């Protein structure tokens, strides 16, 4: 039976006494009674058309009045955390809506983060979502106050899968449903990106053949383990699980390659595929290098969007829950799971990247082109040394059926 998540409302984020001194001098502006429609004032209706926010910001909102300059100045105040346009004073400092929400969420849920670099990451409009540890560190450094975050009704910090079993007609609660769903997607990752290997994080480093094969095995294993631990997927019939992963494993592999900035230099890839040791016609070499170029282009286009971890998790869920797989027992259910993942991504992008209205569309447009990377080419490039002629689809089926870590014949995954 589907469960309906009851909606909840956050308390006001404004800190008492955080507005300027002009607010206390201006008389309060009466607002409409609860439930009454808002009717904007027009000249001749007896009374200024200023809003409470305008009154608090400038005292007197008339052109040339004493509050006009101050109001204009406030409109250009930057967020002290990332430099974006400030929406007002939140938790003691002028910040944008994104940093306000991030700080509130981090404090209320008592979240702890880790930095993948040297704990000195740049925090600005373009990089504020790259490192949550350094973003929270800067929030506290500039003077945002933990004690100013009001405690209100909070969604569960450990949501269960049942909480997300909503029917298509049920409204999605953005805070409890979508953020909780993304948290579960992220928590399902068996390997943090940094654990794919230090060489993987250095795009200019030319990896050896063994390192390439080991990294490829880790990424494939990571995709299967992630799918096995995300919401809803384990509840599907095992035949449906196998069908979905057998169809989408190569797309998940490309997404993982982009997420960990996998070096894709031509020479070691050809060596890993064994093509340097076998005679090949010139046409076949050109064709194979063209496949490598397509792979490189897809990875680079994803990296150019600066996709963060939450977005990658949502994109992988959208790819995984596809109704294109053959032999699905419940196509409509799989389609609904894809829609839920897409809604989660859309709301996340809207809240975390409010100044990039086209970002959600750009992310979705990257998905169809992932299929231009041939799965057979990925097998030849990365897995022929590991498993020989054994199809990857067979290995995926064995991993799902075994229910435990799969032991590769080439090396052990830890």
Swiss-Prot record:
A molecular function (GO) term: zinc ion binding
Domain of life: Eukaryota
One BP term from GO: positive regulation of transcription by RNA polymerase II
Bridged cysteine pairs (disulfide): none
CDD domains documented for this protein: NR_DBD_COUP_TF, NR_LBD_COUP-TF
Zinc finger (NR C4-type): 79-99, 115-139
Main location: nucleus
The keyword Transcription is annotated on this UniProt entry: yes
Keywords assigned: Activator, DNA-binding, Metal-binding, Nucleus, Phosphoprotein, Receptor, Transcription, Transcription regulation, Zinc, Zinc-finger
Region (Interaction with ZFPM2): 117-414
Record's GO cellular component terms: cytosol; nucleoplasm
Biased composition, class Low complexity, residue ranges: 38-57
DNA-binding region(s) in UniProt: 76-151
Chain positions with Phosphothreonine modification: 51
Biased composition (Gly residues): 58-67
PROSITE patterns the UniProt entry points to: NR_LBD, NUCLEAR_REC_DBD_1, NUCLEAR_REC_DBD_2
Bias type Pro residues, positions: 27-37
Localization: Nucleus
Function: Ligand-activated transcription factor. Activated by high concentrations of 9-cis-retinoic acid and all-trans-retinoic acid, but not by dexamethasone, cortisol or progesterone (in vitro). Regulation of the apolipoprotein A-I gene transcription. Binds to DNA site A. May be required to establish ovary identity during early gonad development.
Similarity field: Belongs to the nuclear hormone receptor family. NR2 subfamily.
Subunit architecture: Interacts with SQSTM1. Binds DNA as a dimer; homodimer or heterodimer with NR2F6. Interacts with NCOA1, NCOA2, NCOA3 and PPARGC1A. Interacts with ZFPM2.
Protein name as it appears in the record: COUP transcription factor 2
């Amino acid at each position: 039976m589907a469960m309906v998540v009851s909606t909840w409302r956050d308390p006001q984020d404004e800190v008492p006494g955080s507005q300027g001194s002009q607010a206390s001098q201006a008389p309060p502006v009466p607002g409409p009674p609860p439930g009454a429609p808002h009717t904007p004032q027009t000249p001749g209706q007896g009374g200024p058309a200023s809003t409470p926010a305008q009154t608090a910001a400038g005292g007197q909102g008339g052109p040339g009045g004493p509050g006009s300059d101050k109001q204009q100045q406030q409109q250009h105040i930057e967020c002290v955390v990332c430099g974006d346009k400030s929406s007002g004073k939140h938790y003691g400092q002028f910040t944008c809506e994104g940093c306000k929400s991030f700080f509130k969420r981090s404090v209320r849920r008592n979240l702890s983060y880790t930095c993948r670099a040297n704990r000195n990451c740049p925090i600005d409009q373009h990089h504020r979502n790259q490192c949550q540890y350094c973003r929270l560190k800067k929030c506290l450094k500039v003077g945002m106050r933990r004690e100013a975050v009001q405690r209100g009704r909070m969604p569960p910090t450990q949501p269960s899968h049942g909480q997300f079993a909503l029917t298509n007609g049920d409204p999605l609660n953005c805070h409890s449903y979508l953020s909780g769903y993304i948290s579960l997607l992220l928590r399902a990752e068996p390997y943090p990106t940094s654990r794919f290997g230090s060489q993987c994080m250095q795009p200019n480093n030319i990896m050896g053949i063994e390192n390439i094969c080991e990294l490829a095995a880790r990424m494939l294993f990571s995709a299967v383990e992630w799918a096995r631990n995300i919401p809803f997927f384990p509840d599907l019939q095992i035949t449906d699980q196998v069908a979905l992963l057998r169809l989408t494993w190569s797309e998940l592999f490309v997404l993982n390659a982009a997420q960990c900035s996998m070096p894709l230099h031509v020479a070691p890839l050809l060596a890993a595929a064994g093509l340097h040791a076998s005679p090949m016609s010139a046409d076949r070499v050109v064709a194979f290098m063209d496949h490598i170029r397509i792979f490189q282009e897809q990875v680079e286009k994803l990296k150019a969007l600066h996709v963060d971890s939450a977005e990658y998790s949502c994109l992988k869920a959208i790819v995984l829950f596809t109704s294109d797989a053959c032999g699905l027992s419940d196509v409509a259910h799989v389609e609904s799971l894809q829609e839920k993942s897409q809604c989660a991504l859309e709301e996340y992008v809207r809240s975390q990247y409010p100044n990039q209205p086209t970002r959600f569309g750009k992310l979705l447009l990257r998905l169809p082109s992932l299929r231009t990377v041939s799965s057979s080419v990925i097998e030849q490039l990365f897995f022929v040394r590991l498993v020989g002629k054994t199809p990857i689809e067979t290995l995926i089926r064995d991993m799902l059926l075994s229910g435990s870590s799969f032991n590769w014949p080439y090396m052990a995954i830890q």
